[in-house]
């Protein structure tokens, strides 16, 4: 998209958004790998809950930011971000809500 004669990628705010999105995606991936490694050792309750909580909330934040960058096109079915926006929301609900994951994490920390 072009705004005020510049592409959105030229704006510092967009660059910061993209950087934050990349950090969230990478951190989510690393938490998932850590949970998988813990599962291999027979102890993954806390790690899995942390990965699920962070990744699902990050998915929603990243998709929301992507939607903002795309503007009106983010709501058009021809662009994948519209589908991601709908799909990301359910990640905080299935296999345990964010609140349930927080309960699991705190229970494990207090052991």
Give the ranges of each region predicted by the language model.
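Alpha-helical interface subdomain recognition
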Residues: 1-111
